[in-house]
Amino acid sequence: MKTIYKYILAGSLCVSALSSCIKDSVNQDPNNPPAVPSNMLMSGAEKWVVDNVYDVWFSGRQCLPYAQYWCQRNYTEEDRYQIRESTNNSYFNYLYMGIANLIQVERENIDPATAPGNSAYGANANQIAAAKILKVWLMDIITDTWGSVPYTDVAKLASEDVYYCKYDDQKELYGTLISELDAAVDMIDESEPAFTSGDIIYGGDASQWKKFGNSLKCRLAIHMSKVDPSWKSLIAEAVASGVFEGNEDAATYQYSASGTDYCKLYEGFYVDGRNDFTITKPFANLLMGVADNLNGKSHPWEGTRDPRADIFSPGVTKGVPYGAPSIYSAKLRAGTPNWYSTQPGHLNPDFKIPLMTYAELQFILSEYKGFSDAEFKAGIEASIDYWADAYGKSVSAADKAAYIAAVGSATAEKVAVQKYIDLWLNGTEAWTEIRRTGYPEQVLRPGEYTCEDPNDASAEPIKFTALSEVKGDIIARVKYPTNESTLNGENWKAAVAKLQDGTNNYYSKMFWDVRTSTYDHPANK
């Protein structure tokens, strides 16, 4: 029988040829539609989301370089903000496909035709809640990358006559996402499983999903700390409802060493046979306790080597200077870690990816309490323990205590810098924190010196030069993809008109970024 049904494909957010969000499929029997159990949908959604956020493209060539954790060993143009439009188009689509997949998990547990059958895989309400929480986690990454983006209309694409998605104002979108987290947490029944199988992140534990939802609410709230006084009440609500209580509560995705279900970072190096990335000089120096004398920047605990230095990049003594032209690459990478030959833990096929850690929450709570010492020090200890375990390493209690003592008491800068260190591999969140707080100051801004000239030590040092206009600061956002300008033109134009100078650029700030200069550190509301 020739019939038509609609489903979200999540290409560009409009209907047009193969890039449409609504695709018509023919020759399906409406009385016997193909059914995929909701636990399998969730498993597939989790893998799709983590695969496409933590890979060598969205993370490796964008978010991790923007946070200056790692950079390219050969071709530095992307580190200097020359973004491949093909990559930008693709990952805008891929991340929205993740949103679409999670919406489908919700629908399968709401639809009277499918919900009863899917209750065999976990309480329907708990499945909906888990999908909502992960959807908010992903949507936060999307909006903190591009700014105001489609959201409200996305869920209407397959069920209502909506073919072109408007762009939600980012400030309003944050409110929507927080409301979704509240709704998700409220519907969780901790006496029932979220999933009986298929949930790779929490193994179906509804209590853990609730803690993640509340902890994620704290993350979104702290993002707004410079612009919205309600951030404190939002965190208070989340804490009262139940947040992470230890490293065992962290939201993580465990890859497998068997078959092809391996970590995408591993794939980008060893399956694809490429040796493109290593640790940056700014991050290596931060871990090693080394000041930036070229730019006259001190180190907040100079002379103290971080125990995590040899976890993240074994034996590191220097990193690759960030933002230098590619013509210097061969000389500048000499003596820096070669991850292809000395494999760090994050390049293992079965690496456990962190979506959010307990340590991050502790740093949020320290800031919430006026930069309290107890949560600050608990965060450092938890971070060292978490990362040591994730990499199969160990740090003695004495070494942890000595490091924490050397770091000293909590300040706004120290909390921000320790949080930045813990956010390793979470490039978008670290980039968000740099834009929100202005820390770490060790992160290079365009126009600053990155290294001595390797060809002439007496010459002026080489500068970090941006290849796109960023107004002298770190990149503030990624441009909207060009596909949107053609496939969702009217909504794209309306969104661009609200950006600084009315152009699709890299320097328009997020609503929560109120810094007035490159080293401004705005106070919390």
Question: Where are the language model's segments positioned?
Answer:
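Hydrophobic-face positions in mid-chain alpha helices that act as interaction patches
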Residues: 231-365, 370-422, 426-429, 437
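Conserved, well-structured interaction surfaces
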Residues: 70-152, 156-196, 351
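Specific register positions within alpha-helical solenoid repeats of the TPR/Sel1-like families, i.e.
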Residues: 49, 140, 144-147, 188, ...
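Internal, well-ordered domain-core segments that constitute the primary functional module
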Residues: 172-246
